[in-house]
Amino acid sequence: MTGLTQLLEIGLTGLSAATEAIQTVSDNTANVNTPGYNVESVNQTELPGAAGGPGFGTNVTSIQRAFDQFAYQEVVQASSANQAAQTVQTNTQTLAAIFPVASGGTGGLGAALNSFFAAANQVAQDPTSTSNRAAFLGEAQSLASTFRSVGGQLAAASTSLDGQLASAVQQINTLAQQIATLNQQIAGQTAASGGAPNSLLDQRDELVRELSEQVGITTIQGANGVLDVYTAGGAALVNGTSAYQLAVSSDSYGDGEPTVTYTPNGQDLTNSLTGGQLGGILSSRSQLVSAQDTVGGLAVGLTSAVNQQQSLGLDLNGKLGGPLFSVAGPTAYASQSNTGSGALTATIGNPVGFTPGDFVLTKTSSGFQATDIATGQVTTLGNGPTLNLDGLTITVSGTVATGDSFKLEPTAAAAQSFATTTSDPSAIAAASPYVATAGNNLGNIQATVGNAVSGATLPPGTAVIPAANFGQPISIKFTSSSTFQVLSSGNSVIASGSYSATSGAEIAIAYPSPAPAGDVVPISLSAGTAVAGDSFGITPGGTGSSGNIVGIAGLANQNVLSGQTLGSAYAALVTNVGSRGQEAKVTAQAAQAVLTQAQNTQQSISGVNLDEEAAHLVAYQQAYQAAAKVIATAQTLFDSLLNAV
């Protein structure tokens, strides 16, 4: 009877093993489209029999999932890189739409700049024309509106990024908590059974992959099957069965810029977070801030140059011109952790030498250090109270303690605040402040009043008329063929100079305060023959001239920001945004290709192949039928034995 009993038990083990194998195949087939599912297979071993005899059937030792750690990690890393690249591409497309490119490399703001300067040239054709002046003022207002529109679109894009940032952080926290919960369940089942809880492992691996789409991570396998998860910078998101949260906070300067902090200790992780959607958002934000600063810089450069030129000319009422544009100045924010009472204010004194960008100024024991936020470049400054940085003049007030810091945003608010200051066409200072009239001269030279110049470097030998005489009539009289004097309206000598028959002579009338040194009205005496007694009258009030509006129109071709013209600076911005967009597109395509390849490799190992499962099902069905036949044979033998008794 023992042999027949063993035969029956052997058949039962085969039947049980085949049943479990069929169930496994069925589970594989049912989960063919389940994200994160790893195909499973049955591991069997023979039940050993007596020495020298057959075994006692089979035993299912485990249900093993086809999991390859290397292939899985490749998918995780590729998912993180791809999501970052796709996020950057999407946000770069948004940025590119704000700076359209038309023929000639300009569009939007570039076209508005061109129209403004073209209208200035129209005024120069007929400076007394009210319609020309009104058209110029209309283009100035349109230009200001375009600046504000671009600034508003950039601000809206920034708000959108802030929303994306908050959403990504919330998703990271949710996934981290779910992974920690699964860690607890996996550890419990592993300790209780000693086996691998395949379904829970699949779920956790899928959550880890989803987490990698949100932020770059690394993982470490712990005891009892738990998995620890860290950001690329080393902050623990999951440690065993505990999850740690991230939070979105305002930076310590209170300027409204969000930062990502680590809840357990409040550490700012913003600069250490890479990969995934969060890394893509942070990268996109740096591009956006750069564009905001550059557009703001254009507004500041244009305002400074046009207003300065306006101040050198006369309006239709015979008065020196007032500002045409207004724009918000630099903003300095004190860190909330400062211990001193100090404050900073700043002005952009020289836009030509200024490169738009934001800085953090930190007080050290030896003075101030300025760190360029975009590049990390550190510049050592003095102790104050006046500091000079890249075209900026910074004034320090109060008591600044060592370690105190300030965030300086020179042009962040400029574009949205850009506006015209007048609606009166007669306020346009189109005229040069002086006109020249020749006396009854015997010589053949001419005197020409040039366009007012700001920040001029005068050639050697220039006769400079003091600012105290500005706005008064003066006269130039030759005392010989090679010398001349400049006389005030009271016939006092206020300047003198030498004259060359081959090169002429230069005279400059200095502007009064608050105009800076170097602001002058140039007067040129042409080459030729001068005779003692020859004279020229230089009189103010030439409101019908166009000398100063020509100077305003000429600003289109002068360097006004970072050593560039307005047009070239804007074209460089558009080109940069366009190239960044193309680069982001190529990177996104490459990242998607890498991810697809990694997924295909991983699926070839761990994915469900329905053809293979169909073949397995037939094999296990036959095994089941064979095991059932063994049981039936054992039953027949039992019946034969009983019938023989």
Predicted regions and their residues:
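S/T-rich, low-complexity, solvent-exposed segments of bacterial secretion/appendage proteins
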Residues: 1-645
